[in-house]
Amino acid sequence: MVFKSRIKWIALFVLILSMGSLVVHLSMTKSSGVQLAYSARDNLWQDFDSLLGAQDFRNKHLWRPVKSLETLQPYANPRNSYPAPSSKNNGFIYAKIFGGFDKIRSSICDLVTISRLLNATLVIPELQESLRSKGISNKFKSFSYLYDEEQFIAFLKNDVIVMKTLPESLKAARKRNEFPLFKPKNSASPKFYLEDVLPKLKKANVIGLIVSDGGCLQSALPASMPELQRLRCRVAFHALQLRPEIQVLAKEMVDRLRKSGQPFLAYHPGLVREKLAYHGCAELFQDIHSELIQYRRAQMIKQRFILEELIVDSRLRRDNGLCPLMPEEVGILLKALGYSQKAIIYLAGSEIFGGQRVLIPLRAMFPNLVDRTSLCSTEELSELVGPETPLPENTYKMPPRKSDKQLKEEWNKAGPRPRPLPPPPDRPIYQHEKEGWYGWLTENDTEPSPSPMDLRNQAHRLLWDALDFAVSVEADVFFPGFNNDGSGWPDFSSLVMGQRLYERPSSRTYRLDRKVIQELFNITREDMYHPNRNWTLRVRKHLNSSLGESGLIRQSMLSKPRSFLSHPLPECSCRTSALEDSRQIQSDDGRFLYGGEDECPKWIKSAGVEKSKTDDGDQPDYDHDLLAEQSETEEEFAKSKVASAFDQDEEWDPND
């Protein structure tokens, strides 16, 4: 009897102990779940605060300017005799621009240059993505949705006469389509405008241009027209100022990124459906995304934009450098360079095809990955958009339920007996399955026309790209996911790289060769997360060399012939000290690939000396990246590997 009572007490004790253990585990799970459910913005600032004073400064050289480019200074002023425009000119040019932010920016620069070439007055272009018919706020017109009109007109007063609208006497004739209309390609030459367009302009006094290729004038102008190239620079880098509201919010975003005094890196993935379809990169994605890319590629083949087969080997295209680097690959490259897991990375781009799923590996490697939605509140973004008229929601309506009478009639009209049992009732259809850019794939063979809400969202993308552009230009480091794609269209990353090269040539901008990078990835693709030391050093050598002379030469050879704004050297820069002749490199046609800049005026030299003194006083000197990495001992490398292993999130397995 006593023995049985002891067993009961032991069983009761075990039961209480089990219940207590279960309660403790549940409470721990709940508290950890609450801790994990934080916003990216709160985590960012908490991370900053915890890192103050504890940040490892061994890798400060990864953020430092490139010393070999510090002699370059922005200088787009006219060099020779440059007469001011006259009101007695050859007439007016009005234009309609189609496309996104990058195409708009490049096209406006070409239009101003053409107006100067033809001695004509330019009417402020109409941006078709931001017309009021697209549902934007009545507070803005098309051009003023993005840019400051008054600044644009005032800055160009010594280059081109710019008017907000056509004179009243000509508006009616334009509505009746009485004026010649041209649809130039982005490779149109000055000869085309002087011989074909100018005579009609003089005759009709007004011509119209429809620009849809991201430009209407060839990038490489004759050597006799350097002033027109400098005019392009003055338009892109001075006259085209974002409207004040965008500038203020962009500056606030940069201040928030640098709140703790730490630098940040901007990364633009370049995952845009149009570019992916053009280059045949569908197989790099899965399921619905691959189908959407192939559908767009079929459309481009039908429209004769592409003269290739529909189905191509995407992996072969990737190995040739024709597809963007995936975010996972970029994360591995940044790790190989030595960037800490705590590095702050700003994700630019209004369109990231593939959604958040393709960003998961990068976010796991760098938790401080933020974008405009995590830096700005909903109210701040709404104020930027302005007051808009409410649009009807695109709600999916369930088909009406059939009555008993209808069901009975269908049963009677069915085939001969014995009849099979009716199918079970359909599962409920949820609204999110029929909404969005992918909803049509399950029901239709053709993509439906954009709804009013889709058109409005496309206009909003211009604002998001403008914010990202301003932040990327100000970043301490810029890493492009897809530039120099060879399509002939301007791209976001190339425009950012060009503006950074003009404003701050020594800022760290990686100009990598994707073909070389993919060759390196093919060596270690089976074990990308644990590369050997030789692979890491080869990656570092290539990426660090792309920051300086070799990267600029490659950019000049590949990017400049298609987009002058992506590489405005040597026309729009000067050097505070002359470059040795032995270091200047020219192409076969005599064009400078590296060097060839004029010597800076004294006022630029003196300003540059003062700035360099300030910079030297603020920051200590660091050895060159490549030399520092070559001198790294085996022991230091092992320590860095151990440190990165401790930085790794314990719950994240790279092989999952």
UniProtKB/Swiss-Prot annotation:
The keyword Transmembrane applies. Disruption phenotype: Embryo sac development arrest. Unfused polar nuclei. Pollen tube growth defective. The chain crosses the membrane at residues 9-29. Residues 381-426, 631-656 are annotated as: Disordered. Residues 401-412 have a biased composition (Basic and acidic residues). One of its GO terms (biological process) is polar nucleus fusion. It is found in: Membrane. Its main location: membrane. GO terms for molecular function: glycosyltransferase activity. It comes from the Eukaryota. GO terms for cellular component: chloroplast; Golgi apparatus; membrane. The keyword Transcription regulation does not apply. It is a single-pass type II membrane protein. Pfam families: O-FucT. Glycans are attached at residues 119, 444, 522, 534, 544. Belongs to the glycosyltransferase GT106 family. This is Protein EMBRYO SAC DEVELOPMENT ARREST 30. It comes from Arabidopsis thaliana. The gene is EDA30.
